[in-house]
């Protein structure tokens, strides 16, 4: 075993013939080094294990860039990383216990969609940072999208383009991001000297099955046969996808007759809209990287850091 260890960590000190035999055996046996044991032996060295709790982040396609950025950043700085899924709200305590058994040096709690979480008691006092979520404890550092400013600036873009009759189809009221986005829109509308009475605003019901409710809503706002709105502001790109189908089927020209604004910049989808969808980029990659750097760099202090969300102006506005 000493010879194997020397080959793994200082191959130049081993005779070539011996090194080749050991490497061949490693490949044949699919040997994997015990990193946790190596860490225990490396007393006095900088900690190097980053653990990730993933609540719907790894099991849905919408925010997986958070995880990719965390892993890439950890690798860039020579840290190891591993992930444990949280399968439901009630599963967080189990996942936390499983994670702590590995004695990580830092923990990142991630969620799909901006959420308010209840941190398992076992994680209090640990070196932890939140990514795409917030908690009641102000001492917990968190990195989240700046939904308010993003919607404010996108509304300024629509106003500058001359749109004055918006129809808004927001995500469910229970969604944390919805409040920030609606507030941003309404503030921009008021700051432009406009009356909110001009605006038609609706919230999607909770559940993915309700995206198609937008079809009925749009049909109700064609009087007679023409839309009573000049821009549709969608809670996300999936809602915009439904809207495109309804509008184009009615012969509506986008954006000449009605403009459409999305949110999220769903991976691999924005440019597939015809015409390409104007939307807002959720900065999941930056959120993941900053959360990882918070631990790797030993940043101090707990506060909410809001990450800018770029407006991607394409052809639908």
Region spans (language model):
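N-terminal helix-turn-helix DNA-binding module of bacterial transcription factors
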Residues: 1-45
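Short beta-strand elements in bilobed, periplasmic/extracellular small-molecule ligand-binding domains
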Residues: 74-86, 186-214
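Hydrophobic alpha-helical segments within soluble ligand-binding/sensing domains
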Residues: 141-168, 210-222, 282-300
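An alpha-beta-alpha
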Residues: 154-193, 303-316
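Flexible loop/turn connectors
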Residues: 219-317
């Amino acid at each position: 075993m000493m010879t194997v260890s020397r080959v793994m960590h200082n191959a130049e000190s081993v005779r070539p013939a011996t090194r080749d035999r050991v490497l061949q055996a490693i490949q044949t046996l699919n040997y994997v080094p015990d990193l946790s044991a190596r860490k225990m032996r490396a007393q006095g060295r900088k900690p190097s294990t980053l653990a990730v709790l993933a609540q719907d982040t790894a099991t849905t396609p919408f925010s997986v860039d958070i995880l990719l950025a965390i892993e890439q950043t950890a690798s860039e700085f020579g840290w190891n990383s591993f992930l444990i899924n949280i399968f439901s709200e009630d599963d967080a305590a189990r996942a936390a216990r499983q994670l702590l058994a590995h004695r990580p040096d830092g923990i990142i709690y991630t969620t799909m969609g901006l959420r308010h979480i209840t941190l398992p008691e076992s994680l209090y006092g640990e070196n932890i940072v939140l990514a795409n979520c917030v908690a009641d404890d102000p001492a917990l550092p968190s990195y989240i999208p700046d939904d308010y400013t993003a919607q404010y600036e996108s509304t300024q873009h629509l106003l500058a383009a001359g749109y004055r009759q918006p129809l808004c189809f927001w995500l469910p009221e229970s969604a944390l991001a919805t409040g920030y986005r609606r507030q941003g829109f309404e503030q921009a509308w008021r700051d432009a000297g406009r009356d909110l009475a001009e605006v038609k605003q609706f919230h999607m019901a909770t559940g993915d099955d309700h995206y198609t409710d937008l079809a009925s809503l749009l049909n109700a706002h064609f009087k007679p046969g023409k839309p009573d709105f000049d821009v549709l502001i969608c809670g996300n790109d999936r809602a915009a996808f439904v809207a495109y189908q309804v509008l184009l089927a009615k012969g509506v020209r986008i954006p000449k007759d009605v403009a459409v604004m999305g949110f999220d910049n769903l991976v691999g989808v924005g440019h597939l809209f015809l015409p390409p969808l104007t939307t807002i980029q959720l900065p999941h990659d930056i959120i993941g990287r900053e959360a990882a750097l918070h631990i790797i760099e030993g940043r101090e202090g707990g506060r909410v850091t809001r990450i800018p969300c770029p407006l991607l102006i394409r052809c639908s506005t």
